[in-house]
Amino acid sequence: MKIYRVGGSVRDELLGLPVKDQDYVVVGATPEEMVRLGYRPVGKDFPVFLHPETHEQYALARTERKIARGYKGFEVYAAPGVTLQEDLARRDLTINAMARDEAGDIVDPFGGIADLQAGILRHIGPAFVEDPVRVLRVARFAARFGFQIAPETLELMKEIVHTGETEALVPERVWQEIAHGLMESHPSRMFYVLRECGALARILPEVDALFGVPQPAHAHPEIDTGIHVMMVIDHAASKQYPLEVRFAGLTHDLGKGTTSPDEWPRHIGHEARSVELVMGLCERIRVPGESRDLALLVARFHGDVHRALELRPATIADMLQATDAYRKKARFQAFLQACASDFHGRPGFADKPYPQKEHLSRALQVAVDVDAGAIAMQLNQSHAGKADLPMRINRQVYAARVERISSLLSHL
């Protein structure tokens, strides 16, 4: 029985990056032996065990054989006779197929170290095409490390897309990989790779449709809507904004992809169209509620936020109400972060001031200080009829908030 540390932890260690999760492969053991040694079985599809003390994962060496479409269509074979090299050979990329033995020596049968040094993402063998998730993973690694994709690997990615394997991806896995990619330091790289191999048009056609759609040059020097959206998510990443903000940045302009070419470069009404497309995309790939809800708000209101300095107090109060800012203050700040990223995501705009963000934050601050409870109590004591009391309370609270915002703006 021999134990090897494998995969991402070995890769990251060689790159000088922090090592998070550590995975191990056990060669020459049976499930019964592992249990006798105190390991706890947890794997459903293949033998995986948790270490009795560290609780890290230890998997028996295994091979896989494709028997059906999709990333779950594999038959797994695990036995004491499976070698380390056979186990490593089933992995996706050379940089992920290295191991470190108990003496600390590196086992690198496929040239992973050389590819790390050269900054290359290269597949191991022809079995790469059997798992469509690998298209998403390679794109994500490109965003993480900034590595180039080997030409032959890119060709196999195109083959996976062409054969329709990506259609078999379950929605939850698509979202999982997209979310991971958005959280990388340069998320745009993931989407450019997906577009280059044809996968973006299959899994996120609404985003793919943005490329080649022009915008007014005076407001968008980058012209291309797809490029703009990529700049938006990269700006959000540079500010280390959370996933919800980055996803909202990715989807805020989806409606521009449906503008008739006769109307280019203007996109009148694209906000309403964006809302509809965001909802459909979120339903299709099972986007969690927090990311979906923020994306819908940003799609609908980002134009109003950009015009915030010109808005009347009542219009600002209406926006605060419509975005549920009084109850969800943290989400409203994320909303403003996404709108600011939209502004900054243009050539030459990264360091320009965006006073709208502070303007609306201060408006919320003064409006939220209105004591709705005191207003309700006063009306309850002075108003004989109770039938329309809730409506009267809402009107008074709204009026008080508008007055507070108006007072604020008069002093700016």
Curated annotation (Swiss-Prot):
EC number: 2.7.7.72, 3.1.3.-, 3.1.4.-
Domain commentary: Comprises two domains: an N-terminal domain containing the nucleotidyltransferase activity and a C-terminal HD domain associated with both phosphodiesterase and phosphatase activities.
Segments forming domain HD: 225-326
Transmembrane segments: none
Role of this protein: Catalyzes the addition and repair of the essential 3'-terminal CCA sequence in tRNAs without using a nucleic acid template. Adds these three nucleotides in the order of C, C, and A to the tRNA nucleotide-73, using CTP and ATP as substrates and producing inorganic pyrophosphate. tRNA 3'-terminal CCA addition is required both for tRNA processing and repair. Also involved in tRNA surveillance by mediating tandem CCA addition to generate a CCACCA at the 3' terminus of unstable tRNAs. While stable tRNAs receive only 3'-terminal CCA, unstable tRNAs are marked with CCACCA and rapidly degraded.
Biological process (GO), any one: RNA repair
Amino-acid positions noted as binding CTP in the UniProt annotation, renumbered to this chain: 8, 11, 91, 137, 140
Cofactor stoichiometry and binding remark: Magnesium is required for nucleotidyltransferase activity. Nickel for phosphatase activity.
Subunit structure of this chain's protein: Monomer. Can also form homodimers and oligomers.
Domain of life: Bacteria
UniProt-annotated binding residues for ATP: 8, 11, 91, 137, 140
Family to which this protein belongs: Belongs to the tRNA nucleotidyltransferase/poly(A) polymerase family. Bacterial CCA-adding enzyme type 1 subfamily.
Record keywords, A-Z: ATP-binding, Hydrolase, Magnesium, Metal-binding, Multifunctional enzyme, Nickel, Nucleotide-binding, Nucleotidyltransferase, RNA repair, RNA-binding, Transferase, tRNA processing
Reaction equation(s) it catalyzes: a tRNA precursor + 2 CTP + ATP = a tRNA with a 3' CCA end + 3 diphosphate; a tRNA with a 3' CCA end + 2 CTP + ATP = a tRNA with a 3' CCACCA end + 3 diphosphate
Alphabetized PROSITE patterns for the sequence: HD
Naturally occurring in which organism (per UniProt): Nitrosomonas europaea (strain ATCC 19718 / CIP 103999 / KCTC 2705 / NBRC 14298)
UniProt name for this protein: Multifunctional CCA protein
Co-factor(s): Mg(2+); Ni(2+)
Additional free-text comment from the UniProt record: A single active site specifically recognizes both ATP and CTP and is responsible for their addition.
GO molecular function terms listed in the Swiss-Prot or TrEMBL record: ATP binding; CCA tRNA nucleotidyltransferase activity; cyclic-nucleotide phosphodiesterase activity; magnesium ion binding; phosphatase activity; tRNA binding
